Amino acid sequence: MDEKTKKAEEMALSLTRAVAGGDEQVAMKCAIWLAEQRVPLSVQLKPEVSPTQDIRLWVSVEDAQMHTVTIWLTVRPDMTVASLKDMVFLDYGFPPVLQQWVIGQRLARDQETLHSHGVRQNGDSAYLYLLSARNTSLNPQELQRERQLRMLEDLGFKDLTLQPRGPLEPGPPKPGVPQEPGRGQPDAVPEPPPVGWQCPGCTFINKPTRPGCEMCCRARPEAYQVPASYQPDEEERARLAGEEEALRQYQQRKQQQQEGNYLQHVQLDQRSLVLNTEPAECPVCYSVLAPGEAVVLRECLHTFCRECLQGTIRNSQEAEVSCPFIDNTYSCSGKLLEREIKALLTPEDYQRFLDLGISIAENRSAFSYHCKTPDCKGWCFFEDDVNEFTCPVCFHVNCLLCKAIHEQMNCKEYQEDLALRAQNDVAARQTTEMLKVMLQQGEAMRCPQCQIVVQKKDGCDWIRCTVCHTEICWVTKGPRWGPGGPGDTSGGCRCRVNGIPCHPSCQNCH
């Protein structure tokens, strides 16, 4: 088949498609060309051979790394393979030059229709293989030019070449430079190599300032550096300005959120009590508490009702009130803060709590002295070089050596008078003798801290001194804990340390 006959067949097919598609301009151009060439034609009407309704095509996609994925495409049987490639390019970003279609076990060509390959109903399958683009220099300009040429080919113009906009007027020939025959225009200036970084995944050439691939969104190589002399174009400047504005708004919103959180914490810290914001259950009385009805302890975040916390404070024998939470695993060692206690109690109960703390501090100190005036609350911490204490409450002078008030007598006169009165006081003498017998028989003992006489009524071997509140092990006649207080096993009886009781006769000293 000669070149003229082949060209005539192509123009006839283009005329057929233009008439079927209603394109008057293309049909007129094809008809004029056929008439000028005096090509013999036979025109006849025929029914529609390719259905035009939309169907769903099942496509298996595989790349050069043997990664496979299945997708569904909505197509028409009269679509060409070139149109199918353009659709995949627009929807998924894979350039047509990288697409290789296999339909009906045949390699599909661009100008062939899907109907010619047997794609006629829903569920028909096709195979798409994505070629590696490592050896292909892709850029947006070439992709756009290829797409325009493909659209012209669909219209029947296969031998056209896209030229830049505006007329190109050849200049006068230079003297002394002969022109080669057959060449009416000078050679086109080759385009400079594209500036940018090549995506390691799809090999697309991206602009230097872009942080990720425009095609596959892969991150820019860390080793790439933007050329110092590079000037971004208008599109890049707009994108960079948008990124800067987004970053500024993000930083502004973050700062506003931080300031709001700070103000919220300041307002929360100014409150004496932290109330619950969600429904909770008191672990002591098991009452279900609505938001705002319970108190959340600041130190340990355990939640209780007000009544249980008030009862815990009133019944506490310590200056520091512990959290009442306890279960089968552990008991909480957190403490209630002073402002929490003050907010929970009435003024009278809070004053009693303060008095209890002062009393405990006085009794637990080895250098404290309480005024001997009956019902007087005055006391002090004394030093070795001080022998007298003037009570700030009752204003009586206490002798720290005799531990008594003898304002009209000196120490010698007072002790002689005391011995004389003891000989004549039968009740005082009987009490002294009874205490001595109890100490000798082991029915009583002296507190290892304040030396007062204490005794155990019944039950376990743990007792507490009523004066200095020292915890005592009855069976060892010594303190239960070390100098650090409850839980300090560096001293005391060290009961149950390594599972060993403090004494063979120990009856649980806690």
Curated annotation (Swiss-Prot):
GO cellular component, one term: LUBAC complex
Residues the entry annotates as binding Zn(2+) 4: C399, C402, H406, C411
Coiled coil: 233-261
Zinc finger (RanBP2-type) stretch: 193-222
Domain Ubiquitin-like: 55-119
Region named Interaction with IRF3: 1-220
Zinc finger (IBR-type) in chain: 351-411
Region (Disordered) location: 160-192
Role of this protein: E3 ubiquitin-protein ligase, which accepts ubiquitin from specific E2 ubiquitin-conjugating enzymes, such as UBE2L3/UBCM4, and then transfers it to substrates. Functions as an E3 ligase for oxidized IREB2 and both heme and oxygen are necessary for IREB2 ubiquitination. Promotes ubiquitination of TAB2 and IRF3 and their degradation by the proteasome. Component of the LUBAC complex which conjugates linear ('Met-1'-linked) polyubiquitin chains to substrates and plays a key role in NF-kappa-B activation and regulation of inflammation.
Protein name per UniProt: RanBP-type and C3HC4-type zinc finger-containing protein 1
Organism: Homo sapiens
Gene: RBCK1
